[in-house]
Amino acid sequence: MQAFFIGTNSKYIHTALGVRYVTEYCRAYGIFAHMLEATVNEPVLSVLTRITEQIDACDGGDNETILIGLEVHIWNRQFVFELGELLRKVLPDCFLMLGGPEVMFHPVKIFDEARFADFIVCGEGEEAVAELLLRLTGYE
């Protein structure tokens, strides 16, 4: 299993702390976790290309399970939803997960709006995401 956590910031001077925490927490459990940061000012197709290139560079084989986590904030929601739709088309077999403050208050509504998503993580994600990944790989 490979996990890729994507943080989409409003500017280059911002950093996605949640993505960093989740990535490092998963690595502590032996999960192959990677992160990528982008901004809402980048073309969504450029970010999509960067994600797919990073996945290709870390390729563990045709049968490897891939999870992509997208962090959703009020300032990047539209961008992330567009990116999620494109990821679903380009990588139909991967798991797509949403997390962050914008999804935790109305997860059912978010699932209705973001039909591309397989999972939504509410609240602090470090433990929940690591547990999800371990269960997906069969290491409960």
Where are the regions a protein language model picked out?
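A generic secondary-structure signal marking the coil-to-beta-strand transition
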Residues: 1-2, 64
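Nucleotide-activated donor-dependent transferases that construct or modify glycoconjugates
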Residues: 2-11
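A generic secondary-structure micro-motif detector
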Residues: 11-12, 73
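Short N-terminal binding/cap micro-motifs at the start of the first secondary-structure element
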Residues: 12-18
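Short catalytic helix/loop segments, enriched in acidic residues and glycine
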Residues: 18-27
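Glycine-rich beta-alpha loop elements in corrinoid/cobalamin-binding modules
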Residues: 25, 32-140
